[in-house]
């Protein structure tokens, strides 16, 4: 019997029965809540945006606390992701919150690879979770899940259009993380410009195929509010932890010479909408989407690379041992092929080196013979010059000896004439 037939038969055999008394499995939701509260929750936020755009301030405002952060410089050589984990507690619910900041994002002159560090970080967290899942003795209960649940993408309030860096980065991230675009420092542009800017942003995201996170509408309990809030994306937010007195009460706001921008006033900005959607309504859906959609996509690709794959219902499923053996044979075959390629490459390299050495030896031999001929020619020239010089010296010596003999004879003849005159005078 095929697998589909078995499944069809099992579906037909299901029957609804009435119980005559209370059993107790209606407490399962309470058990799940109790277990979840005891275990606690984790939530990981990735803040992507340029330095000084207000990422840290918004996080402080969202969670109504002050997180310890370091001042970021505008002169970073590259993009560095800096995670910080905090333990928060509200009522009896414990939350392990991790905020990951993209230090130096958008500060470089060449921004082509700015997104790469962000993508690598997200993949690394997926890989860490996958490695824990694949362990023989795994402990996912105690494992710190560092997978990114939401990416808050901070858009500079230019009022014109998205930067190419923003489009490229969000396109690279949309299949790996839930993206919620937000317009930072929304109090720097007018309401009319802000409305046009929102429309322009959503139009560019759609035209470039960027898939941002849509608040779910399949749950009747939150379908209406989520549907309304989807129409408000991207949220235009203002962050501030300072309290300003407005009327008779203190509110979180930004004080300007021309007035006050209240953070939690929905007519001033979308901060309340962001907080409602991110924390109070859809936090669990963000965690679930991360696991069931983005992580599963990464896991499937990795397992397919390792040789695992799903089978059709009508085919015989592969066992783990068969998959391992097939992958092992493939690996050994690939290793043998690589070894043969390296051996052949080494042989070719040796032959090339020998040919180069022989060619060099021939060139050196030719140069040696040429120098030897030049030396012989120069030696012959020197010998000829020496011989000519010796002949000139011998000729000179002969002429000198003849000259000296002639001078000696002339001197003797000259000295004899006075003696002869003296003799003649005496006679």
Curated annotation (Swiss-Prot):
GTP binds at residues 49-56, 104, 185-193, 239, 254. One of its GO terms (molecular function) is molecular adaptor activity. GO terms for cellular component: cell division site; microtubule cytoskeleton; septin complex; septin ring. Residues 49-56 are annotated as: G1 motif. Gene3D superfamilies: P-loop containing nucleotide triphosphate hydrolases. InterPro entries: G_SEPTIN_dom (IPR030379), P-loop_NTPase (IPR027417), Septin (IPR016491). Keywords: Coiled coil, GTP-binding, Nucleotide-binding. It comes from the Eukaryota. Residues 184-187 are annotated as: G4 motif. Residues 101-104 are annotated as: G3 motif. Residues 320-409 form a coiled coil. The keyword Secreted does not apply. CDD domains: CDC_Septin. GO terms for biological process: cytoskeleton-dependent cytokinesis; protein localization. It holds the Pfam family Septin. Residues 376-389 have a biased composition (Basic and acidic residues). Residues 39-305 form the Septin-type G domain. Residues 406-418 have a biased composition (Polar residues). Residues 376-427 are annotated as: Disordered. PANTHER family: SEPTIN. Belongs to the TRAFAC class TrmE-Era-EngA-EngB-Septin-like GTPase superfamily. Septin GTPase family. This is Septin-8-A. It comes from Xenopus laevis. The lineage of its organism: Eukaryota, Metazoa, Chordata, Craniata, Vertebrata. The gene is sept8-a.
């Amino acid at each position: 019997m095929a697998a589909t037939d078995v499944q069809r038969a099992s579906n037909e055999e299901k029957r609804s029965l009435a119980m005559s008394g209370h059993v107790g499995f209606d407490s399962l939701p309470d058990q799940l809540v109790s277990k979840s509260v005891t275990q606690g929750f984790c939530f990981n936020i990735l803040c992507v945006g340029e330095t000084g755009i207000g990422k840290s301030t918004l996080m402080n405002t969202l969670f109504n606390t002050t997180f310890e952060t370091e001042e970021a410089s505008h002169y970073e050589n590259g993009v560095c992701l800096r995670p910080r984990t905090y333990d928060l507690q509200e009522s009896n619910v414990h939350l392990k919150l991790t905020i990951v900041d993209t230090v130096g994002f958008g500060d470089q002159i060449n921004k082509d690879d700015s997104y790469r560090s962000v993508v690598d970080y997200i993949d690394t967290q997926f890989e860490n979770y996958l490695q824990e899942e694949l362990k023989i003795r795994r402990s996912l209960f105690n494992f710190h899940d560092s997978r990114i649940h939401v990416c808050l993408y901070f858009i500079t309030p230019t009022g014109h259009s998205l930067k190419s860096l923003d489009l490229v980065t969000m396109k690279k991230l949309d299949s790996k993380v839930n993206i919620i675009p937000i317009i930072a420092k929304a109090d720097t542009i007018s309401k009319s410009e802000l409305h046009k800017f929102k429309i322009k942003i959503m139009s560019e995201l759609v035209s470039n195929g960027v898939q941002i996170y849509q608040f779910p509408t399949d749950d009747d309990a939150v379908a209406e509010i989520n549907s309304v809030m989807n129409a408000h994306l991207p949220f235009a937010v203002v962050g501030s932890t300072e309290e300003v007195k407005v009327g008779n009460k203190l509110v979180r706001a930004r004080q300007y010479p021309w007035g006050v921008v209240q953070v939690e006033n929905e007519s001033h900005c979308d901060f309340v909408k962001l907080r409602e959607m991110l924390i109070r309504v859809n936090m669990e859906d963000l965690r679930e989407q991360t696991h069931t959609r983005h992580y599963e996509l990464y896991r499937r690709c990795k397992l397919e690379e390792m040789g695992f794959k799903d089978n059709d219902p009508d085919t015989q499923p592969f066992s783990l041992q068969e998959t391992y053996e097939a992958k092992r044979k493939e690996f050994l075959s690939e290793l043998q092929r690589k070894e043969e390629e390296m051996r052949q490459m080494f042989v070719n390299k040796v032959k090339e080196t020998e040919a180069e050495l022989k060619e060099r030896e021939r060139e050196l031999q030719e140069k040696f013979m040429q120098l030897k001929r030049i030396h012989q020619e120069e030696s012959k020239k020197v010998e000829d010059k020496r011989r000519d010089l010796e002949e000139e010296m011998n000729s000179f010596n002969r002429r000198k000896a003849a000259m000296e003999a002639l001078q000696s004879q002339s001197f003797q003849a000259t000295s004899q004439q006075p003696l002869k005159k003296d003799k003649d005078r005496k006679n």
